[in-house]
Amino acid sequence: MKVIDQFKNKKVLVLGLAKSGESAARLLDKLGAIVTVNDGKPFEDNPAAQCLLEEGIKVITGGHPLELLDEEFALMVKNPGIPYSNPMIEKALAKGIPVLTEVELAYLISEAPIIGITGSNGKTTTTTMIGEVLTAAGQHGLLSGNIGYPASQVAQIATDKNTLVMELSSFQLMGVQEFHPEIAVITNLMPTHIDYHGLFEEYVAAKWNIQNKMTAADFLVLNFNQDLVKDLASKTEATVVPFSTLEKVDGAYLEDGQLYFRGEVVMAANEIGVPGSHNVENALATIAVAKLRGVDNQTIKETLSAFGGVKHRLQFVDDIKGVKFYNDSKSTNILATQKALSGFDNSKVVLIAGGLDRGNEFDELVPDITGLKKMVILGQSAERVKRAADKAGVAYVEATDIADATRKAYELATQGDVVLLSPANASWDMYANFEVRGDLFIDTVAELKE
């Protein structure tokens, strides 16, 4: 870890705990800052706040009192999940207090080169693929960021012999100023998190922050399958390296079933260890990064062939009497579910879908669900999903929760079929996050097998 003194004796407010806030508070304390932590959860129900207080860090819990900002803070570090419309953040900005997220802190202290991955879908799988390929090549990829390991925590243990592979959400990228990866990847961009950003343009702008400090010496890996992303290529100072399954590009591409990098075959598409056209795109992005980092083709091929996927991302769970169960709980939007379905024969799929109602209609999903064996629909968005099923001519049943949905899907399936949890919706109407939803699916499958 680089020792920096820019926070020494500075008063810093950490707004919101969870993993990233807790990590940021400890790091800032270590760097000599005078840290105050403010979290909305009551102290008695807040083990993170209790631990920080025991470590000598000031904590204020149970709400976000605006008068707290009457103190002269030099900086606010906010939890990524707290929107900029929060009154505390609005007041801080009005007072001229800089507002950052902890990935900025991670960048400032990291001795390791940074590869940043963002996008609407495919971030976690691509991040994991890149980390595994680099580690296999002796470059010791350390995963961090939105993938579940706070960037500021991992950066403290990273050395110049590691590579910091960061999954970055739009929430995190809104709060960067000096953040400067050597390689950045944008997997795709589609309307999501509009409830947080307000406008799709604001969401895209947040994602685009990943390249703000990049120069021609850095590489920006872009998905040329998508016109929106392709059009961004002319708006960066970085050297653009494209990937595509639709055209031959000066980067990584698919042609006649083979994955190429700049004219050289790396591996066959059907050798990738996980199914689906979206995973071909993820593999191409990984190949581009790996080749830019000097990894040989054999290492790339062996690693991607052995890749078993990521939990909750089209994860194979089990086979019960010839019925295969896949957990794709991370599919919280339409595009993700479209990608998941592309890897299967619809006539053999029982799809579990539905969740938080964000006001979306699901007409875009109609061509992709046409021909499904059956659907099991649940959640706040059930009526909207049912309308799409009716348009597609797909029979469905309703379920009360994930356990009920899993049991009903199994009853509808026969030998050779697939039960696919790919909700096309966020989980927050019923569950704290997609991980909880996916774990309940996995647990129910285990019960069915008993």
Swiss-Prot record:
UniProt xrefs under Gene3D superfamilies: Mur ligase, C-terminal domain, Mur-like, catalytic domain, NAD(P)-binding Rossmann-like Domain
A Pfam family this chain is assigned to: MurD-like_N
GO annotations of cellular component type: cytoplasm
Compartment(s) where it occurs, according to its Swiss-Prot or TrEMBL record: Cytoplasm
One GO BP annotation of this record: regulation of cell shape
Span of the signal peptide: none
Broad class of enzyme this protein falls into: ligase
Major localization listed first in the record, in broad terms: cytoplasm
NCBIfam families in UniProt: murD
Chain's role: Cell wall formation. Catalyzes the addition of glutamate to the nucleotide precursor UDP-N-acetylmuramoyl-L-alanine (UMA).
Protein name: UDP-N-acetylmuramoylalanine--D-glutamate ligase
Gene that this sequence comes from: murD
